[in-house]
A protein has these predicted regions:
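TRNA-recognition modules of translation machinery and tRNA-sensing kinases, especially anticodon-binding
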Residues: 15-199
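Short, Lys/Arg-enriched N-terminal segments with co-localized hydrophobic residues
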Residues: 1-14
Length: 199
């Protein structure tokens, strides 16, 4: 009778693994230029909906969370503050920085949405949001230095997507924005962030 819980647990684990539907692959058919991505595609862990746009399977997603948690832990230890900025950003904040035309016409990097509510861009980066957020939050030089960071999806209109995940149109990125009193403080922030990733 005592063995039943163990048998039940083993059966549940087998069921979980079988439900992942991981495909069998022949390693001889792998593209040597992009072996990692090619293996993921053949396993079914990476699915291409269109050039530069991918969906990710269970193993990929779990691994991504593990890596994110390691990064978050190190950034938090370094005194950085986790935030979340909108992925849908109004044109007006990009007009304030005079970068709307740079990102939509000159470089043609940003995906845009124009409807009866107004004009918006899907975030290729978040300097505008970070600047406005910091200006509202940091009322005195005594609040400096401050480093805000987020981990989230970004969107860029890559014309020539290359090598699966090297230049996709959607991707997850950790971006950090620092507010410093002096250039020396800014350099110290850079060294701090460098050390975070060395850890």
């Amino acid at each position: 009778l005592m063995c039943y819980p163990f048998l039940f647990k083993e059966r549940v684990n087998k069921m979980r693994l079988s439900r992942l539907n991981i495909k069998k692959i022949n390693l001889n058919d792998i593209d040597s230029n992009y072996s990692g991505q090619d293996i993921l595609m053949k396993l079914g862990e990476l699915y291409q909906f269109e050039s530069g746009i991918y969906g990710y399977g269970n193993l990929w997603t779990k691994l991504e969370r593990v890596v994110e948690n390691i990064i978050i832990e190190e950034l938090d230890k370094a005194g950085c503050i986790q935030v979340e900025f909108p992925k849908l950003q109004p044109r007006k904040i990009w007009d304030q920085s005079s970068r709307w035309d740079t990102y939509t016409k000159d470089g043609d990097i940003m995906f845009t949405i124009n409807n009866n509510l107004g004009e918006y861009g899907l975030a290729p980066t978040a300097e505008e949001c970070a600047t406005l957020f910091g200006a509202n939050r940091l009322s005195s030089y005594k609040n400096l230095p401050a480093i805000y960071y987020q981990i989230g999806e970004k969107f860029r209109k890559e014309i020539r997507t290359r090598g699966y995940l090297f230049r996709p149109r959607t991707f997850v990125m950790m971006d950090a924005y620092s507010f410093d009193k002096t250039e020396e403080d800014m350099q110290m922030t850079y060294e701090l962030m460098h050390q975070v990733y060395l850890n």
